[in-house]
């Protein structure tokens, strides 16, 4: 397995350069790889590497910070539009005959959500967060942003606010922050309680940013009207993940 520490160490123990993506490079692995001189992460996020340990050993860690800016932001909006229009559901049920058997000319199982005039709160306002904000603004949305670093370009796209304000005022919350030890399970029972009733959640950053049981509970109770996620805490997704039930 690509996450099995002994196998990773065995594969890397005689190498000078490790090129990885989802493979965790832990202290245990680094201790077992005395020849390692460079770690290249084929992703923007580099949370799979114990960077503190790598630094102690003098091993540089490289990532690819801008390879997916356009595609990831586009997909975030695609996930949001799916929540608003349930396109997949209506395609599937129309093919199953639901529209053909409908008494009215208009077949729709869910009300549509119009985004113009609504507020999107973007947590993490780097390249991808800002690109997502530009698309949201083009759809007529108001953009709020929360980020440890502010920029003039960010201010042209949206308004920087503290996290509590963003949670309280946003109709849609989209996550675009890196995963750190400080923000693991950022979206949990307490932060969800601060959100608007019926808020929508989008996450194509890192699955560990969510407490998945708390998000599932919020979806089942109706506190969250929907969540569109293409990342989970363990990938491939486990069959017992609460978000699947």
Language-model features, listed with the residues they occupy:
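An N-terminal-biased, well-structured beta-alpha scaffold segment characteristic
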Residues: 1-62, 168, 188
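Short, well-ordered coil/turn residues at beta-beta hairpins
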Residues: 21, 42, 79, 176-179, ...
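Rossmann-like adenosine-cofactor binding region
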Residues: 26-30, 142-144, 148-242
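Phosphate-coordination loops involved in phosphoryl transfer and adenosine-cofactor binding
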Residues: 36, 116-119, 189, 198
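Phosphate-binding beta-alpha-beta segment of Rossmann-like dinucleotide-binding domains, i.e.
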Residues: 57, 65-119
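Residues at the starts of beta-strands that form the adenosine-phosphate
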Residues: 119, 133, 141-142
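Glycine-rich Rossmann-fold phosphate-binding loop(s) that bind the pyrophosphate
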Residues: 125-126
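N-terminal Rossmann-fold NAD(P) dinucleotide-binding loop
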Residues: 129-130
